[in-house]
Amino acid sequence: MNIYFGKKIPITTCQIFDNEKKEFVKATCYEYDCQDKSDFTEIKKLDDGWTYKQETLDNMKRKFTANKNGINSEIAIFSLENKDGEILGLCNAENKKRTMEVRFLESKQDGRHKYVGQTLLASIGKEMLKNKQQKNFIIKTAIASAYDFYEKTCGFMMDSIFNCDLIMGRIGTYKFIKQTQERTQCPIIDLKV
């Protein structure tokens, strides 16, 4: 049993490419448990260049309230951070019984790092695969400019059955994780038991 005294739980370690250093650097994917209000501090400190900063804070508050009232919340908030603790990517999802549904994904828009969104999604996919009941990895509402990323880079497919934009099954998720590990020249290593 892992016990964490911080405000976030490490999920995976991985690598992303630093365009300034021209090399791969270590990164860690975290999940915020929203057990106390200190969890909001890092997100509040983000600059206003983050499109989904307020939505992330709102979802954290919803999860905090649910936790406080003893209700199991499906909201899942993930971040990808470099070794200095700088947030490079954010993802808000719903961790449902049979699906992991990504509501929005965003990476820092400074152009310094490559593979942030892909690595964050692959880390979340790896977390999803641990739940044997979850069958599909879903992008619920992708913005038009992100379709190339989700379809061509990650391998999600257009959906006509579920009420969502893009979908990937378990086999596709395994392939996507493998492809991401090859691109980033590093395994995505589980930290959460």
Each language-model region and where it sits:
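Non-catalytic substrate-recognition and accessory regions of acyl/acetyltransferase enzymes
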Residues: M1-R112, S123-I138, Y147-D148, K152-V193
